[in-house]
């Protein structure tokens, strides 16, 4: 690795460790199999493609929110830390005669976020890492690196700065990226998470839980929608807090809260009642739907 000054080429690139669940699906039936147990159109994916999807239960609830990467001879699922047992056990019970293997790759490699405009310059200098991109966790430039214990040292030698966990959380909320187990749980319906355009295909045909998803689509809406909220009124609130309307009824519940990049603002993710979910709506003093 060239140890010369890379400060100009790396630009504003930063990195941070991020524990992830990584599941590799192999076998000739892998695409058709995952297609039958998730909300997106997996069989259309080609090597190099990436999509988001929900893994749904028979009741149509969300067992997981995953980013799916199609690589040569495999599909790779990336999601929040600690989800491997739930997802593998769920999917494994449906493997009967299919040529499908599920491999828990969590913990085999160290996982890192890399984000910023100078990523190509950094990538050309790194050896022994695999890039999963785009990831989207903290913005459009965000990539996930699969490396080892030496990855952080290599990045520091390239003068890539390590971001704080608070900074990563702010960027995640500003990107509107939901974290399973924090913003989404098994109690949620896929449409409540409000990622229909990027995580749900309404034309792909049958899959486990599809009847519930299709019924909601036919009815027109769910009562609660995931939304980004901003405003100084969030300063006194925390994840789990609820916001009531003038009549005392709950109109929002926060799932994640952080400082915004603007030091005069706060930001949160949470579920807002459908009647108040339109962008620009003021739901409380100093709190607006983004």
Predicted region positions:
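Acidic, proline/glycine-enriched N-terminal capping motif
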Residues: 1-63, 69
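Short amphipathic beta-strand starts and helix->beta connectors
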Residues: 2-10, 54-65, 95-98, 123-132, ...
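Acidic, low-complexity central loop/insert segments
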Residues: 12-15, 21-22, 67-178
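Short, surface-exposed ligand-recognition loops at beta-strand->loop->(often short) alpha-helix junctions
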Residues: 24-33, 114-119, 230-238
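Glycine-rich, small/acidic residue-mixed loop/short-helix segments
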Residues: 188, 194-200, 207-210, 214-290
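Short amphipathic alpha-helix segments
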Residues: 54, 116-127, 236-249
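Anionic-ligand-binding alpha/beta catalytic cores of soluble enzymes and soluble regulatory domains
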Residues: 146-227
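Short, intrinsically disordered, mixed-charge
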Residues: 35, 39-43, 89-97, 218, ...
